[in-house]
């Protein structure tokens, strides 16, 4: 892995997929790597925009599984973005650990692995509707802003913690508002291409405070959400 996005996400999990005009990552298979090599020195060659994009998945992992990691990022963000070894090694190791722990319990995404989709219901839809003008991490950042707003609206997360997540994304330099050029009604329709949709119903992974997600019933981590509420959240961003 020579980028932070690859180190945080693509290199761990075993999914090898391709994008389609309909949506991203729709066609693929599972093939687990035997080892993952992360070259932190290569991160120094990245444009700032690409480094920030990788931070989107990094913060997502902290949000779903590690309050300690979230607080480390808050306190050491400048060191991460200036490629200090101790800080970069910390996020590289913890990204891999969090994703590995989830994937090894649910490789085929029959339940628990859905938590890795935190923020992606809106995020992937924005990525596609933007015609990929937004990088994956930029779209995910907006998706995470939508997710914490929804989590707070449903009473699973305090408004203070929701704002804390959004502020951290903004400190990285990532967007948390939907660009004006995106048609919001088209975005609402695109939500239905999300892989978590069941029986025509939108389903969202919901955050339960920083470092945890809601398990709605045994091995069920996504909640059906009415389109009207999803539209309301999107119109606010």
Give the residues covered by each predicted segment.
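Structural motif
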Residues: 45-51, 85-87, 133-136, 197
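A glycine/threonine-rich phosphate-anchoring loop and its flanking beta-alpha core
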Residues: 2-78
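Gly/Ser/Thr-rich beta-alpha loop segments that engage phosphate groups in nucleotides
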Residues: 15-16, 30, 121, 125, ...
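C-terminal charged capping/lid subdomain of soluble metabolic enzymes
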Residues: 56-58, 156-237
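A generic hydrophobic-helix recognition signal that picks specific residues
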Residues: 25, 32, 112-113, 202
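Active-site segments that bind and position negatively charged phosphate/pyrophosphate groups
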Residues: 71-186
